[in-house]
Each structure stands twice: as structure tokens, then as C-alpha cells.
């Protein structure tokens, strides 16, 4: 994903799966952002060595390495959401093994170029196996982007609180999953 929006989307998706669909879900942070540590501090008041930690109905796992992934796979989760961070963090082989892949991008003027570049690069390698989603930008910009570059991206509904699933978000997740 592009910077800005990926972690928020991942938390929203994990909460939809765990809180709304009542599935056993976990979010893994496979990037160096440290966002989940900040989330843990804000939501629980502490930052511990505890991995995974829980907020509401979902589990969160910070600073995930290859060994942690193996461990999580043995824990019987219905859904494992992985936040790979920015495409600039380099390619992660684990990404291509996921059942569902989402590229979270932005239609803000200063970010749409890297969104387009990644799409074109992967398309050239014939690796287009993900759904493109957009966090920021108007519907008009999304349509123009789609028309100009033939990249169809669905707009993620705005949600100020990643932990509460609005009706619009519920319908959105139902559509993309």
C-alpha cells in the first residue's frame, strides 16, 4: 500500500471480521511502521512485550517476522489480515501467497503517481492479482484515474473510527471479500 491509509484499512477490516462477522481474526504488522505499538499504547494504555495483544474482539501482532507467521498459522484463526506497509518497503514473498490481496492507494495528487507506477509495474510482470482500493480523493478523481490509466479502484468509505463498522463499511467489506 501507499503511505497513509493501509493500517487504518487493515484495522477496519480486522474489526469487521472479528466484531461484525464474529470470526477469529488477527492483524499482523509485517512492516517497520510501529503503528500497532502506537495503537496498543493508545487503546490499552501500555506497550508490552505481549504478542498478540487484544482490542475488543480482534488480536493484533506487532513486528512480525517469518517465525511469528508460522506460529500464528497454528493458532486456528479464521482470518489473518497482514499489513505489509508501503510498496516502497520492498517486495514480500508472503504477499503473493495470500488468498485475498488489496492494494490500498491514494488519489491525492501527490500520491497517485506511485499508485499508478506500482500497478503498471506489476501488470507488466503479469502479477495483477489484487483489488485496488483508494483511501483519499474524490469520486470524480477516482473515475478520472480509472478512465485514464484503466485501473479500477474501489473507494474505501470514510470511517473516523476504525473500530466501529458503519453500515456503509459493512456493505463495502461484503462486496470486496
PLM features: residue spans?
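Histidine-centered active-site loop/cap adjacent to the catalytic His
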Residues: 167-177
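P-loop/Walker-type NTP enzyme "switch/lid" segment
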Residues: 1-5, 16, 20-90, 95-97, ...
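Hydrophobic positions on the alpha1 helix immediately C-terminal to the Walker A/P-loop
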Residues: 9, 13
Amino acid at each position: 500500500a501507499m503511505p497513509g491509509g493501509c493500517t487504518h484499512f487493515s484495522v477496519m477490516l480486522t474489526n469487521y471480521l472479528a466484531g461484525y462477522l464474529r470470526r477469529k481474526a488477527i492483524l499482523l504488522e509485517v512492516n517497520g511502521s510501529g503503528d500497532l505499538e502506537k495503537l496498543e499504547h493508545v487503546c490499552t494504555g501500555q506497550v508490552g512485550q505481549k504478542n498478540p495483544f487484544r482490542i475488543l474482539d480482534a488480536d493484533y501482532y506487532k513486528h512480525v517476522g517469518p517465525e511469528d507467521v508460522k506460529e500464528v498459522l497454528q493458532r486456528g484463526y479464521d482470518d489473518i489480515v497482514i499489513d505489509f506497509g508501503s510498496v516502497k518497503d520492498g517486495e514480500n514473498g508472503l504477499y503473493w501467497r495470500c488468498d485475498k490481496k488489496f492494494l490500498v492507494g491514494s488519489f491525492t495528487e501527490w500520491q497517485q503517481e506511485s499508485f499508478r507506477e506500482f500497478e503498471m509495474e506489476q501488470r507488466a510482470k503479469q502479477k495483477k492479482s489484487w483489488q485496488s482500493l483508494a483511501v483519499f480523493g474524490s469520486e470524480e478523481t477516482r473515475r478520472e484515474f480509472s478512465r485514464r490509466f484503466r485501473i479500477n479502484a474501489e473507494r474505501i468509505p470514510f470511517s473516523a473510527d476504525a473500530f466501529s463498522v458503519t453500515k456503509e463499511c459493512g456493505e463495502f467489506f461484503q462486496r470486496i471479500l
